[in-house]
Regions:
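Conserved acidic functional residues
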Residues: 64, 112, 122
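Class I (Rossmann-like) S-adenosyl-L-methionine-dependent methyltransferase catalytic domain
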Residues: 1-50, 56-108, 127-134, 148-250
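A short SAM/SAH-binding and catalytic strip from SAM-dependent methyltransferases
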Residues: 117-130
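A short glycine-rich, Lys/Arg-flanked "PGG" loop and its adjoining helix->strand segment in the class I
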Residues: 133-145
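A short acidic, Gly/Pro-enriched loop at the edge of an enzyme's catalytic core
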Residues: 108-118
Length: 250
């Protein structure tokens, strides 16, 4: 079954208890700090620190806590009221954050040509192709020329079987079944964005069910050819970081 905006509202806005503020999803790395410094930051280090950052679907602030130290101003946008309210309380002492509740696909509250870097981690994996298409169209409007984005999204649609009209592999992590790395690049092309990097990974299993896509609103004299990496050993990266975390934790 494909998750809808209503499904995401029900799950993350009402059903899920968020007792650990989302840190429970960092256990494979040994904790959120190890996830951030071992996996996320090395992949975005070319783009931060910077001026204005937008985080899409921050949840309860798992990545937000690090982004606030890497920018002059941070916008956070989430579909769920409870997520935004939690972030407001958690980051009460940070005066350079603006909070927005959206409809799950629009960024109309963000000004044109105002954002240097966009990040979304471990959230849009549950959003179907039409949502990613909308967010990339909006990204083209709000990014400054030369601005960049890093979005973690589903690739499980790669395993769609047209004969059976089903995904041929088990979708144990509730990934959006219409989304693929190929579609992400097509959406970038349509929005006049350059998709510069795509790392297709195995998240919590053996299949290449996820993708990290890096894109830019390039200046007129710059062109990027997409570089691809099929990383079927992403789980080994997580395990290595967790082993280090477990060994050195006191």
């Amino acid at each position: 079954m494909m998750p809808t905006i209503e499904d995401n509202l029900l799950c993350w806005g009402k059903t899920y208890d968020w007792k650990d503020n989302g840190d429970e999803w960092s256990q494979a790395w040994g904790g959120t700090e190890y996830l951030w410094y071992g996996t996320i930051l090395p992949r975005i280090l070319s783009f931060v620190p910077t001026g204005n950052i937008l985080e899409i679907a921050p949840g309860y602030g798992r990545c937000t806590q690090f982004l606030i130290k890497l920018c002059k101003h941070l916008d956070v946008v989430d579909l769920n009221v409870n997520c935004i309210e939690s972030c407001k309380k958690r980051f009460l002492d940070s005066s350079h954050i603006s909070y927005h509740i959206n409809n799950g696909k629009s960024l109309d509250m963000i000004a044109k040509n105002s954002i240097d870097f966009i990040l979304s981690w471990d959230s849009l994996v549950h959003c179907e192709a039409d949502i990613l298409n909308s967010y990339l169209s909006e990204s083209a409007r709000i990014l400054k020329p030369g601005g960049w984005g890093f979005i973690h999204h589903s690739n499980i649609g790669q395993y769609y079987n047209s004969a059976t009209r089903n995904i041929s592999s088990k979708n144990i992590h509730a990934r959006a079944e219409t989304m693929t790395a190929k579609l992400f690049k097509e959406f970038c092309d349509k929005a006049d964005l350059f998709c510069a990097r795509q790392e297709i990974i195995n998240w919590g299993g053996d299949i290449l069910n996820d993708c990290f896509s890096v894109f830019t609103k390039s200046t007129i004299d710059t062109h990027y050819d997409t570089k691809y990496l099929e990383n079927s050993e992403f789980h080994k990266e997580c395990n290595r970081i967790k082993n280090i975390a477990d060994f050195y934790k006191m």
